[in-house]
Amino acid sequence: MIKSFKDKNLEKCWRTNQCNKFRTDLVRRVLMKLDLMDAATCLDDLKNPPSNRLHPLHGPEYKNCWAISVNGPWRLIFCFENEGIFDVRLEQYH
């Protein structure tokens, strides 16, 4: 379950469907992935579909953080702890 967002525009998009801050070609997939994340009770729940490409992030600033693919270089980044998913944000790799 999603507990918090690091990106307030992303939170607004998910909660209200007011997504004018994001590229229109990404919105549908981002919202679908956020719904999957909110329904997840453990990390294994995010391994399917395989196109999520769930993977851990490395580095001191990414302790307990993971990413799933959205589209091309876009990823949803989040931290996972027993209580749920925290600090969700959308980032473009590269």
Question: What do the predicted segments below correspond to?
Answer:
Residues D25-S51:
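Short, solvent-exposed, low-complexity loop/linker segments
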Residues C42-W66:
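A short, surface-exposed loop/turn module that caps and links secondary-structure elements
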Residues M1-K33:
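Arg/Lys-rich, positively charged N-terminal/basic patches that mediate binding to nucleic acids
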Residues L57-E61, W66-H94:
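Enriched for short, Lys/Arg-rich terminal
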